[in-house]
Amino acid sequence: GDLVRRVLLLACVLAWGLRLSWHVGRRSAGKGEDPRYAELLRSGDAGPARRAVLFIFAPQALTLFVVSLPVQAGMIEPGPVGWLGWVGVAVWLTGLSFEAVGDAQMSRFKADPAHKGTVADIGLWRYTRHPNYFGDAAVWTGIFIIAAERWPGVLTIPGPVLMTYLLAFGTGKRLLERSMRNRPGYRAYMRQTSGFVPLPRWLSRRLARDAG
């Protein structure tokens, strides 16, 4: 494959992964096991080890394979990176910025004791309820665009589609909002703030009214 494209894809994935690992590690330090996984491992007739394989590790491995298809294809594609590839880099950079800024804003918000029990209606969170999830989807869409410039990269579109679906409709947004829905002020926040794609408040409110 083209050396520039290979290095570009590697750099994009590495930068995204290192930032996310640092953020999750710092946020989770000293807080014990993720309660979602703990509940999953306790429920059902199968033992914890079997449930971990069937419902955590195996699905994550399959998801990783599909989501990384653009990277796999991009590593073997011939031909130089053209204008579409650099559009992909711009989309990736936009997504990474949304993730990083959104996470930083939320961390600062939670660090203030005065905000305990309130809704983070600040910064990027005024335009989307999940700027970090939107950013994650944009990151992998950008990586797909870099790979889609050459054959067979265009065939790897299931990667960003699956990632976006999981974040917007699957295990990401849906599970989080299920636990947040009863927090004071959160339902009002949902009515005036876009659920995924960043939108101005007036448009989000109008769409919510039209949806009934």
Give residue spans per PLM region.
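Hydrophobic transmembrane alpha-helices
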Residues: 1-20, 24, 52, 62-105, ...
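Active-site neighborhood of divalent metal-dependent phosphoester bond hydrolases
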Residues: 20-37
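Juxtamembrane helix-capping/reentrant segments at transmembrane boundaries
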Residues: 32-55, 118-125, 195
